Design a protein with these regions (language model features):
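Nucleic acid-processing catalytic cores of prokaryotic defense/repair systems
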Residues: 46-49
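Extended, highly charged clamp/arch subdomains and adjacent linkers
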Residues: 4-12, 17-39, 52-249
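NTP/phosphate- and nucleic-acid-binding module
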Residues: 1
Length: 249
């Protein structure tokens, strides 16, 4: 029996794109409203963690092949560059669908059962802001380690599968003047005044819960939660006392 015809590329599916299809099916479970709400949220989380692992292992391997100029095609007839292009297109669509599912389905459903997620710290009420600032001082600040980058300090090592906040900071004017006077560099004083942007990172600690529960609204009975990184972003200026924080995300 001649099996050669069955080796045609059209008879095979690319392994990596097949995996993306699997993750799409997982996300479809999160879109099924017959499934309990918190189970649907778990499926969104699983989709995200699967995608992280996929990029860390499989996509990294394909990029290594491209860098090594390895051009052999797989059984589906795709080389590494073609696979990466296909993966990029499909995963962009997957992530967009993931965010749509979370924002348009999961979040409204949570609000309907009395739990509101505050997505931006600017939306906090005065009482909530006071609570999260106190929580930051007591629980978050002691476990944070900000890292800056400049000509003397290379880009900091960021661990896999960690959440980090990036910030652009500038030396405060009074600090620049003080530094110039201490060095007695009168001729270069104007140059010292020039503010240069510096990049800094803050790793969101994994030892703390990602979602922080805020006090219940006594009038409506509604409960509120805010993301840990939003609290850090709100208070990030406390980590760089000699700097102005231009932006942080």
């Amino acid at each position: 029996m001649d099996i050669a015809p069955y080796k045609k590329p059209e008879y095979f599916r690319n392994r990596e794109l097949s995996w993306v299809s699997f993750d799409e099916r997982v996300l479809n479970e999160a879109r099924d409203k017959s499934i309990p709400l918190f189970e649907r949220l778990k499926f969104i989380s699983i989709t995200s963690s699967n995608l992280d692992e996929f990029y860390m292992v499989r996509v990294a391997s394909l990029k290594d092949q491209v860098h090594a100029n390895y051009t052999k095609k797989d059984l589906s007839g795709m080389d590494a560059k073609e696979q990466l292009a296909g993966i990029s297109k499909r995963t962009h669509e997957l992530v967009q669908l993931q965010y749509n599912t979370y924002n348009r389905s999961a979040v409204p459903s949570l609000e309907h059962v009395g739990l509101t997620i505050i997505s931006e710290h600017e939306k906090l009420t005065k009482e909530q802001a006071e609570y999260v600032d106190s929580y930051f001082e007591e629980n978050i600040y002691p476990v944070l380690t900000p890292m800056a980058m400049d000509s003397a300090r290379p880009f900091p090592l960021i661990r896999n599968k960690t959440l980090n906040i990036g910030a652009l900071v500038q030396k405060k004017e009074d600090s620049l003047l003080s530094r110039a006077e201490d060095k007695k560099e009168k001729k270069g004083k104007e140059k010292e005044k020039e503010k240069e942007l510096e990049f800094a990172t803050v790793q969101v600690p994994s030892v703390l819960p990602r979602f922080i529960l805020l006090p219940q609204d006594e009038k409506t009975g509604q409960r509120y939660v805010i993301l840990l990184e939003e609290i850090i972003e709100r208070n990030i200026g406390k980590l760089f006392l000699s700097y102005d924080v231009v932006c942080a995300h």
